[in-house]
Amino acid sequence: MKREVALAVLERNGAWLLQLRDDLESILYPGHWGLFGGHLDPDETPSEAVHRELLEEINWKPAFPLEHWFTSQNGPRTTHIFRGALSVPVEQLTLLEGQDLKLTSKYELRQGSIWSDRRSEARPIAPGLDQVIKRLLID
């Protein structure tokens, strides 16, 4: 079964927004830091999906459409990565899905785990984020 997802790399003041995923065994990388976004609904474009997911997960709509950055293929999974600016302070976001959200620096991204203020513990970065982190560190 082919599966497509669309994820958002959102930057604000030199830091990137991450989501601490729920601790649910039914999801990919439970309890790991990842990007906001999710699956494509039937007949939905990747761009439509990433914008819908941002509303559903953090109640935020970008002022301008996010830019398609790259697409990766891993077996039956196609991941569309979008990039753009987070135009509001993180405190203005409403976390509706996941355990925490955080703006992270390049230094934190290199460490492999990130501290969660809400959970009061460090949690690992999702292994699937490797490609995104490598590209961010090159920029």
Regions found by a protein language model. Give the residues of each.
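Conserved N-terminal beta-strand and adjoining loop/helix that marks the start
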Residues: 1-18, 36
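A generic fold-level signal
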Residues: 1-3, 11, 27-28, 74-77, ...
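Unchanged
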Residues: 39-64, 69-122, 139
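Conserved beta-strand and immediately adjacent loop positions that scaffold enzyme active sites
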Residues: 7, 32, 100
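Acidic/histidine-enriched, glycine/proline-rich intrinsically disordered or flexible terminal extensions
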Residues: 131-136
